[in-house]
Curated annotation (Swiss-Prot):
CDD domains: GDC-P. Belongs to the GcvP family. N-terminal subunit subfamily. Coiled coil: none annotated. Keywords: Oxidoreductase. It catalyses: N(6)-[(R)-lipoyl]-L-lysyl-[glycine-cleavage complex H protein] + glycine + H(+) = N(6)-[(R)-S(8)-aminomethyldihydrolipoyl]-L-lysyl-[glycine-cleavage complex H protein] + CO2. This is Probable glycine dehydrogenase (decarboxylating) subunit 1. GO terms for biological process: glycine decarboxylation via glycine cleavage system; nucleoside metabolic process. Its EC number is 1.4.4.2. It comes from Thiobacillus denitrificans (strain ATCC 25259 / T1).
């Protein structure tokens, strides 16, 4: 085996010391029938340089994709320094240490993360993170029911990400919680609030919603409080650099804010690892799941950091724990903290503004193509829903169009017609600050050619 630091003389000396003639003698108690021997279908090993060359050749076969898919995972530029710092040995762990106070550096980093998140959301307290955005929303629903005490009904708009809704349904299925789905206005894509909601523990307020549409968050928050519920903000953290923080929604502000932290420095990587964030008002801190790092002083009066309010956690009182999540996504939180620190408020605002500007520009270009129209006449952030069936494209599905775009190296968006059949053939398109004007023109030109081919001869595939 390569890279074993023992010479043949070292091996012989060690074997002689234990009375073995060869390394094979160390395994002579294993029956021959259980030994694999040489694997005939496995080729011999390659030198490191040859392996690197092979991997490079394999990777080059993927080509370059122009990505316009979002729906919860977004392609943002990540400065090289982020993961260079994050993967230093001092940080390279996925967990809060079990002897936490012995790792003051890790605790201070999480404390700084919590501080940044409370400033972004405008709320009082942040935890050390949860698994992802979907599980964070599910935990927020449970938290709202625990805090409200008099109702176990939670209102969840249909404009919340379908996968998030599915996770919430799975989480609360056997806990006696009633999830009430709210419809959206087909013209605006915004949530329709019921005139007589009855008693409920909380309302989930997505901003922006799954369609990319900006909801009337001030109205929704005040309506929730007027009806005795808690306002649960489900937000994209990038938007908080330019939009009103949840803590300032309406007259009193949202009570809980959650979301997916992936846009803050985590690469797109087959679904993870990412992290969920959760913040809340001070009134509800004892119902908040996950770990919380606090700042304190030691016996000598020196400042230090410690895990606080641990009685909420599973490893202290399992039967009364606020959650079955007893860890956090420490490594990805480290990257998010570096990302927010390096970009600062102005940098985050530039990312958000550039993403929005690119989305507006692409929506205008694509909306000018015959057969393409925006599904909703409402302001959006960096995602927009486009409808592809105007009557001239009979027999053409969103799936077919996206496949044709993919043949040209363009990941044109997400087909949402399965989740929202009432929209017809519709795709959710996302644009971030990583796209240039040439990228937008490239997409628009190919989409127009694809649709013109479909209009002339729907059965034919688009080839060039």
């Amino acid at each position: 085996m390569p890279f074993i630091p023992h010479t043949e003389e070292d091996v012989s000396a060690m074997l002689g010391a234990i009375g073995a003639a060869s390394i094979e003698d160390l395994f002579d108690e294993i029956p021959p029938a259980l030994k694999t021997g040489k694997l005939k279908d496995v080729p011999d090993g390659l030198p490191e340089m040859a392996v690197a060359r092979l991997m490079q050749e394999r990777a080059s076969q993927d080509g370059f994709w122009s990505n316009f898919i979002g729906a919860g995972v977004y392609e943002h530029h990540i400065p090289a320094a982020i993961w260079q710092i994050t993967t230093r040995g001092e940080f390279y762990s996925a967990y809060t240490p079990y002897q936490a106070e012995a790792s003051q550096g890790t605790l201070q980093l999480i404390y700084e993360y919590q501080t940044m998140m409370t400033r972004l959301t405008g709320l009082d307290v942040s935890n050390a993170s949860l698994y992802d955005g979907a599980s964070a929303l599910a935990e927020a629903v449970l938290m709202a029911v625990r805090s409200h005490k008099s109702s176990r009904r939670v209102l969840v708009p249909k404009t919340v990400h379908p996968v998030y809704r599915s996770v919430v349904v799975t989480t609360v299925r056997n806990q006696g919680i009633d999830l009430v789905e709210l419809e959206y206005d087909p013209a605006t894509g915004k949530t329709v609030l019921p005139s007589e909601p009855g008693a409920f523990a909380g309302l989930v307020i997505p901003q922006p919603n799954f369609f990319g549409v900006l909801e009337d968050v001030h109205t929704m928050t005040d309506w929730t409080h007027a009806n005795g519920g808690l306002a649960i903000a489900l937000v994209n953290p990038t938007t908080l650099a330019v939009l009103e923080a949840p803590g300032k929604w309406g007259t009193k502000g949202a009570d809980i804010a959650v979301g997916e932290g992936q846009p803050l420095g985590a690469p797109m990587a087959s679904g993870g690892p990412y992290f969920g964030f959760m913040c809340c008002r001070q009134d509800f801190v004892r119902q908040m799941p996950g770990r919380i790092v606090g700042r304190t002083v030691d016996l000598d009066g020196k400042p230090g950091f410690a895990l606080t309010l641990q009685a909420r956690e599973q490893h202290i009182r399992r039967s009364k724990a606020t959650s079955n999540i007893c860890t956090n996504q420490g490594l990805v939180v480290t990257a998010a903290t570096q990302y927010m620190a390096l970009l600062g408020p102005q940098g985050l605002a530039k990312v958000a503004a550039a993403s929005h500007a690119n989305t507006v520009a692409l929506a205008e270009k694509l909306g000018a193509i015959p057969g393409v129209a925006r599904a909703f006449a409402s302001p959006c952030f960096h995602e927009v829903v486009l409808k592809l069936d105007d009557g001239t494209l009979k027999g053409t599905s969103a799936k077919d169009v996206l496949r044709a775009l993919r043949a040209q190296g363009i990941l044109g968006g997400l087909d949402i017609s399965g989740w929202y059949p009432e929209l017809g053939q519709a795709i959710l398109v996302c644009v971030t600050e990583t796209k240039t004007g040439a990228d937008l023109d490239h997409y628009a030109q190919h989409l127009e050619r694809i649709l013109s081919k479909r209009r002339e001869a729907p059965p034919c595939a688009y080839k060039n």
